[in-house]
């Protein structure tokens, strides 16, 4: 594939409210939205929609969120050969509160994302070796990030690490 992206896949649960609650406070919110998310999954979808040939490497749970995510990847024409399904952990979930100014508070339960291992990366070696670029983030175990980066570098493949300080 043209691009190999490895990182997180979450289900985002978003509640909009006038303001963010203070610690220990319950407030009434407005609209509730449930979307597919995770930095890696968002980038894979964006690249595929722009016409990129994308292989995504991640772990999801064997649950309704994982099933819906896998279905979405197929609709977006993302290669899911290396999307691992683990029964030991649920799919990742992010609870997001957004106020009327667009400020947010996010809590992530990594779930299956936290099980992406160097063994998973080794299994995905054919996709990494065929890619022209490997795009990664830091929402999965660092050992799998460094392992994938070294694997790509060894074959002269461009590595792009997208870092956010709040992850």
Segments predicted by a language model, with ranges:
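Conserved small/polar residues in nucleotide/adenosyl-binding loops
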Residues: 1-7, 163-167
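Glycine-rich beta-alpha junction loops
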Residues: 9-11, 61
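Acidic-glycine-rich active-site phosphate/pyrophosphate-binding loop
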Residues: 12-24
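Conserved N-terminal subdomain of the carbohydrate kinase-like
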Residues: 23-27, 34, 49-132
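A short, glycine/small-residue-rich beta-strand->loop->alpha-helix junction that serves as a flexible
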Residues: 32-38
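A short, N-terminal amphipathic alpha-helix
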Residues: 39-53
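Conserved beta-alpha-beta core of the PfkB/ribokinase-like small-molecule kinase fold
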Residues: 127, 131-165
């Amino acid at each position: 594939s043209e691009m190999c992206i490895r990182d997180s896949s979450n289900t985002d649960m978003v509640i909009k409210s006038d303001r963010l609650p203070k610690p220990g406070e319950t407030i009434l919110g407005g609209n509730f939205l449930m979307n597919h998310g995770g930095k890696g999954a968002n980038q894979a979808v964006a690249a595929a929609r722009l016409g990129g040939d994308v292989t995504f490497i991640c772990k999801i749970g064997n649950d309704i969120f994982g099933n819906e995510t896998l279905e979405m990847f197929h609709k977006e024409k993302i290669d899911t050969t290396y999307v691992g399904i683990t029964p030991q952990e649920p799919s990742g979930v992010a609870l997001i509160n957004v106020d009327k100014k667009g400020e947010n508070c996010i809590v992530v339960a990594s779930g299956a994302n936290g099980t992406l291992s160097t063994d998973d990366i080794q299994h995905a070696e054919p996709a990494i070796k065929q890619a022209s670029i490997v795009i990664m983030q830091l929402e999965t175990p660092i050992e799998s990030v460094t392992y994938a980066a070294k694997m790509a570098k060894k074959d002269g493949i461009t590595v792009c690490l997208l870092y956010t300080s709040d992850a």
